[in-house]
């Protein structure tokens, strides 16, 4: 059994609680792998390769936007405009099981992502943003700009996304109505046919007329009188 203070012990405890390394999570398949070997095997599986072939540039762009937006919102809501370690913010962000993972974005590491935010002017970074090295001495301090989440470009992008969602919802509603209409027509048409074919009480009545159409009444025979007088 591993020691209480060993890394192996806490790794097993994290696995029991369902806390796995985010680097071994497949965002496309939404599957968490246990270690590097499992993640590598998953990347070679037919189901994963099939889904990867269906990913478009718009999907990758959406992952980048969602990851960046979620990170910045958490930074602003919990820490305001004070300086904070980026690693602490990231650890808080990944506690949400439904978050977009970094390995699904264009960012290779948290350091590279923080430099990207600094160059974009969305956060203040206490480091050289033009440096390309991944090793940073000390904490990776960042501070958000007050206007970083309410820029006009992002507001316009959100409006366009809402309009697109409304168009998609209207199209889906139209399809559902047409499908329901077709199903209703299929139900009523067989019922009408069965009612017509099942009514066997009606029969044809043939009427035939002879002669000129007049009805001749038979004359009543009158017995002869005893006195010999005849009446016509």
Swiss-Prot record:
InterPro entries reported for this sequence: C2H2-Znf_KIN17 (IPR056767), DNA/RNA-bd_Kin17_WH-like_dom (IPR019447), KIN17-like (IPR037321), KIN17_WH-like_sf (IPR038254), Matrin/U1-like-C_Znf_C2H2 (IPR003604), Znf_C2H2_sf (IPR036236), Znf_C2H2_type (IPR013087)
Pfam families recorded: C2H2-zf_KIN17, WH_KIN17
Miscellaneous comment: Present with 4590 molecules/cell in log phase SD medium.
Keywords: DNA-binding, Metal-binding, Nucleus, Zinc, Zinc-finger
Superkingdom to which the source organism belongs: Eukaryota
Subcellular location(s) per record: Nucleus
Ranges where the record places region Disordered: 180-199, 211-232
Stretches annotated zinc finger (C2H2-type): 24-48
Gene name of the record: RTS2
Name this protein carries in UniProt: Zinc finger protein RTS2
GO cellular component, one term: nucleus
GO MF assignments: DNA binding; zinc ion binding
